[in-house]
Amino acid sequence: MSLFSRLSTWYFSKKSLPYWGIILLDCCLILFSGLLVYTLNNGVLSTLDILGHLLVTLLVCLIPYLVGFRLFHTYSGIIRYSSFVDLQKVGFAVLFGLICVVVFQVLTDFSPYLVYIRKRDLILSALLAMSLMWMMRVFVKYFYVSTFRVAKAERAFIYGVKQGGVSLAKSIQNQDPARFVLAGFISDMAEIGNRYLMGVKVYPNNEDLIGVMRRLQADVLLVSPLKVEAIRNNQEMVDRLIKANIKIYMTPAAQEWDGKSDLSHTQLREVNIEDLLPRDKIEIDLEAVREQLTGKRILITGAAGSIGSEIVRQVAQFAPERMVLIDQAETPLHDVRLMMARGWPDIESYTVVSDICVRERMEELFEEHRPDYVFHAAAYKHVPMMEDNPEESVRNNVDGTRVIADLSVKYGTRKFVMVSTDKAVNPTIVMGCSKRICEIYVQSLDQAIKDGKVRGRTQFVTTRFGNVLGSNGSVIPLFKEQIKRGGPVTVTHKDIIRFFMLIPEACKLVLEAGTMGNGGEIFVFDMGKPVRIVDLAERMIRLSGVKGIEIRFTGLRDGEKLYEEVLNEEETSKPTFHPKIKIAQVRAYDYADANLRIDALVHACAVEGDMQIVKRMKEIVPEFKSQHSKYEVLDE
């Protein structure tokens, strides 16, 4: 290693050069400039004759420059991070020193020990010194950036050329150590021409994009906040990037960025598969929901689950008077309790570990808190588990719903909102059928109240939607775990498709549908475009960067469909107040008959076997046809 390399490595390994070191360098440059200008104007021999006196003169002239350095703090910055502001400070300090020297020369007679320097030479030496100080700072910064700061940085393109992309570019240029080096911008404008932005070229977003990135050795794409929605809805572009092993990083979406503040490079994160699935932006009438929930008493069952905990989060933002949060899972409910204490300490909240099927305990809670709104998210949801344990599906899902619904009526709850599932439509599984029975019960109870057959004021609303991204036990966390273990990734069938929705988006629609409904409705959510599960698995494997992960097809599970529905053959839908929400028009059931059938079903769970229990479920829901299941014999 050369001496220069050793010195530069030593210097840049330090946090900064001591301030006296910067002052010493600047003083040397001023002395050198004065000596050089005088020599060029008066000759080498003449300069050598008076060299001692000349050096004394230059040292005296240095004093006002030192005062200027002090006044303008030219030594307070770190040279490797010099900016235009730092160069300005140097310019002002040199100008101050020059003016002081000229004024001193005009007002006083120079001592015989000092050499008279013409004003022109003083000005030229000051300009030269200032230029050298600027050059020194620019060189150190450039050398540091090009050699040390970006040594381990990845070359990156930025998708987006407006304020979001520019702010992102500025952010990554100020990183230390650098994570990324800007190699180019990508624009959706058809005709880009030969345009440059912040010193790099702007390229069109077309089929040549991957080739351009490879040619420039860029293997990272940074997505501007204003382009988050665009890349989600451009699946062709996403597929090309993933297949080329281009890593994608995202910043907060446009709605989370005010468009003015600087973006921090710490906000950049590598995308998850959830970030890249196509979805429409969902807006709800926040003021209408706020008007319904603010200052009210809210009870939420299943409050520690994926959906329930998000409902807790979103309801808390509307400042209810009291929240009663029920779940039988102790540890995750404790996490919800801590979240409430940390995020909404002013809300009176109660976390209750209990089974919703225990009517006596639930009645104590209703009598004490008398909730205005009930959000019922508690349910067993795992398909294979419920196929093996139909009595628990009935006990928890069906009877638990009936307990909470009956108590809501008894204690004057204004509105009961039940979270259902698209698996309740033409059910082929026990879990889906149990949720359909829940729908039948709350709908028939709502109609009985309207008809005056049951005394009460409660309005019952059902919300029905499909899979949510990232919920506990869902396919995406499962695939992540399988990839982490090295595979294989298991998919039940190559043609299986599913609808997906983000948990926060689903819960927004639950809140709006629940608060806006008039009772008796089954609200069906528009889940967007379906996703092939095998395509999802392939994308996740590519995003992980792990090679050689096998996808293994295991066959459809008991009761599993190739695709899910939100309406059955006999149901139609009509539009509502929200374009993403429709009302399913389903056939009505008699409350007394439904209640008797459910009584018999719940009793059967205590005295009969699985086959008899499922047979009774099929009698209540005739469209329940088992598939790939031991219960298929009951349909013959």
Language-model regions: role of each:
Residues 245, 288-292, 444, 448-636:
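Strand-loop microenvironment adjacent to phosphate/nucleotide-handling motifs in alpha/beta enzyme folds
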